Amino acid sequence: MASFYVNGQLVTAEKNQKLLRFLRDELRLTSVKDGCSEGACGTCHVLIDGKATKACVPSVDKLEGRHIITVEGLSDTEKEVYAWAFAKVGAVQCGFCIPGMVISAKALLDVNPDPSREEAAFAIRNNICRCTGYKKIIDAILLAAETFRNGGRIPQESDRARVGEAMPRIDAKEKVLGTGKYPDDIYLDGMIYGSAVRSRYPRARVLAIHKEKALALPGVVGVYTADDIPGKVKVGHLMQDWDTMIPVGKITHYLGDAICLVAAETPEILEKAKKLVEVEYEPLKPVFSPTYAAQPFAPQVHESGNLLCEKHVSRGNADQAIRDADYVLMYHYETPYTEHAFLEPECAVAYRDEDGVTILSTDQGTYDTARETSIMLGLPKEKVHVTNMLVGGGFGGKEDMTVQHHAALIAYLSGRPVKVKLTRSESILVHPKRHPMKVTITMGCNNDGLIQGVKAEVTADTGAYASLGGPVLERACTHAAGPYHYDNFEITGRAYYTNNPPAGAFRGFGVTQTCYAMEMTLTKMAHELGISPWEIRYRNAIRPGQTLPNGQIAPPSTGLVETLEAVKDICENNKNMGIACAMKNAGVGVGIPDTGRCIVAVHGGKLHIRSGASCIGQGLGTVLTQIVGTMLHCDREDIVYEAANNVDAPDSGTTSGSRQTLVTGEACRRACQKLLEAAGADVKVSDYTGIANIAELRDLPGENCGDGAVGTELPETVQVDWKKLEGQEFYGEYLAKTDPLGAQDVANPVSHVAYGYATQVCILNDDGTIKEIDAAHFVGKAINPLNCEGQIEGGVAMALGFTLTEHYPLYDCIPSAKYGTLGLFRADKVPTINSILVEKKGQDMACGAIGIGEITTIPTAPAVAGAYFALDGEMRCSLPLMKTPYERPKMPRYWW
């Protein structure tokens, strides 16, 4: 027993436990987040006697008489200032790390009210953020400091919601103050706790599961095996090959496989019960690499074989073009597994309802979760109700189910509400990673530096299950040729199953790996030709009206050249410089139906936005709010963005592929057009394009809403009385039509409805440390410039880790990483990142916007590697890069 003060109140802890658990589970102070419980991430920071301390470290019996402050205990003035400052500068994305950042900021400002930028960065060095790149968090701390020095007075802010303006995010305040709810913040009456007993071996036959001892433990609600599943055992995002649990007699595929599920009244009883479950195995030799998987004598990971898929894309005659070229280069490249390391571990709460089961989730696709769970439960998908809570980061790692179906199954079988949450070590083990890839690329150029032909072979380790391995490989291949204009290329890719952890979606979606190979080879080619790396890219850059290597004609909105021109002076004025270009699709494309859907409803005198699209920190709710505000000339206070769900919000697909701003943004715009028409405005919605014909209200006929580079905003004098439409709903839908990969009957296929383009430059100091990254990104129309900058800064910081420091070591298919050993960049190590937004009109959908969530990570690695090539002349062809000041001792390499 220990007594101490929490937010000024004397409290007594009856049992000894970590302070984090006491604050959350007993006092319900949920601003204190559980990101790792390993003392590594900083999301649980509190003040103990004025010092920022990770609450997962001290036990309560060591805190007698101490004073603890959480965000809930800040003064009203402090709360208002921090909430305003973090929102004002765009420092909030997923938000999971932010309360901990606020505590570290307060610890600094209480002793140093006027810190420097370096001092602010040092103060949050023990707080990890995977979304922002830290720049805007430091901006927020400095703005808060200035505001406190001026008496805490906050200036009056505009309530406008307009496209093109840096409107603060609609969910910023609740995330800063910790009042918003992530699934782990939910505590229901009668709630039990569930978890999986996982495989002891990456590959083994399960001979028997003995659960009697666990069931005999008081407080255990149930132990469930594959035999208890009412529907199908196997689920999967695209391919149903992922076992909900491994049945007795079957073979495990990786260490993260669930053998059985245990449910108990408390987390403590749950952990004891899991240890009492006895599983008999027959260990088998695992498949540890794609090279081994491809051998005819290798064990079969799945009955279908070890080859998940093969992709082949070509145009022209690459072999002949390379033979005829004046210069030919061939290089081999390797990239490793990397971990998403989002701050919020996977968590779901589920309960039975009168119509089926409800899941309160943190994932990237509510409808996908409902569909897969319904297959497992043997229920119609309409009886599985999924609502997305706040999502503490995803980056692709929350596309596949991890805990949602397990929670639903326990709730369905037990009849009790249940919370299933992965520990950080489980999260690192279970969810899919970035694909390791091996790329061999051959490039031919003429004497003028024009690319004549490119060939590439790509090999990927997709791990234990398919996940998104097929589409990732496809995207890696279709983008391997780069954003350049030439007619001859041939790319072959193969993805193999192994008994390693699965690989799936990760920001960049396969393009990050092949772009590294293509761009580094192009940098070397420029060196061989005696021209600058900027010049060779400018000569080859795709321009409007030209054909991309895949045959798609570049539309007028194509903006690669403009991104190159934006960094020309930077390149010319710095010697230790590397540069890389990239393109990335927005939307699924390649012939797959890709639909955005949105409802704008008038309810209670407000405009309600409803869409099944998940907001995972990228700011979709803010984007849709600005589109509605622009179209209907209303302010933020008039608009309510509802949480994504599959009950009363239409299916708008998974949040991936940089698609939601484009497809759901366009659907939202169309819904607004229908509302305008119903209100009596002179608006006609074309069934073919969905573009509003409001010529008399536009400077440019057929252009969309928004000001500046893309069009003109609806005049403020044009008003409609939308409140008279109370009770009505307006449905918008946009179908992005594209041609299938390898379509033979289409001369110029449309692989994707839109592409983003980028050029990034890395400048080194003479000692090899990075001085700055300059990132020029074509965004079409920046619906929210702050959001765009935040995506760029966060994407670059994440990519710097991928390039220089991050690794996910495996030994015989067994990972050994902890959160603190992943090599994530921290605030005091991230270099200056300068965002350059390139706007250009011509793209019709979604007010001219193109999503940039993924492309921000893609060109960083080759830009950095190119800078080191400029520094010492050495080609670095594997990641993370070796022989840099950032290299970590004894960093293991992926074993091919």
Segments from the language model and where they lie:
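Glycine-rich loop/linker segments at domain edges
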Residues: 90, 165, 171-177, 305-348, ...
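Helix-loop-helix junctions that connect adjacent transmembrane helices in secondary transporters/permeases
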Residues: 296-377, 540-606, 690, 740-750, ...
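Signature of N-terminal electron-transfer/Fe-S-associated modules in redox systems
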Residues: 1-156, 590
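Conserved beta-strand/loop scaffold segments within soluble protein domains that form the structured core
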Residues: 281-284, 369, 388-390, 395-483, ...
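Short beta-strand elements
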Residues: 46, 174, 180, 347-352, ...
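C-terminal catalytic domains of large/alpha subunits in multi-subunit enzymes
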Residues: 226-227, 378-383, 413-418, 447, ...
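Extended active-site and interfacial segments that coordinate phosphate-rich ligands
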Residues: 174, 275-288, 364, 371, ...
